[in-house]
């Protein structure tokens, strides 16, 4: 009886340690994943559109690419905006997405919180 009790306590203790780690791993999205969306900037992503920024500020251009580049020149960061889920992701490797400003892309990488560590970027369409 005592041996079974010790075994059950050990199993319970191990479960209490391992289960939160598994949940954290799932939540953080460890492992390579694929993300799709438009390479936008941190000024325009809250609205999910460049239209408001282009209407408010002159010199932002008349298309997504020009607006994104102009916002980044003002100090904004490149972001990935998933139009389907309305999710905004930060991008750790800004240089890897810069040439895709204002374009729809597929990013392969790992997710930690809402930040993508970019491995590869391909333009869609």
Task: Describe the predicted segments one by one.
Residues 1-4:
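Positively charged n-region of N-terminal signal peptides that target proteins for export
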Residues 9-23:
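Bacterial N-terminal signal peptides
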Residues 24-125:
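Conserved RNA-binding domains used in RNP assembly and mRNA/RNA metabolism
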